[in-house]
C-alpha cells in the first residue's frame, strides 16, 4: 500500500494507528502537482467533490463555480486553499474528507 495524505493530521493518525506507512504532504507548504490533482479529480468524480464549501477564500470559491471546466481546473491548481481536506491517495484510488470506512477497505 502506497498512501499519500494531503492535509490533516487526523488522517495521518488513522494510518499510524494501523502501522501503515504514509507520505504526508502539508498543502500549506507544498501544493499538489497538476498530475496529482488530475488523478485525484478523476478518482473522486470531478472538481466539485474537491471543493470545500466552507473555505475561507469565498471569492475564489465563487469564481470557480462560474468558470468553464478547463478554467476551473487551472484556477483550482493556482488556489489550492479551497480544496477539501484530507485528500488521501492509494495508487489510483482517492478520497476527499475523513473516510475511515473506505480506507479500511484498502488494507
Model-based region annotation:
Residues 1-30:
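Local sequence-structure signature of Cys/Sec-based thiol-disulfide redox active-site neighborhoods
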Residues 30-107:
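Thiol/selenol-based redox catalytic cores and closely related redox-interacting motifs
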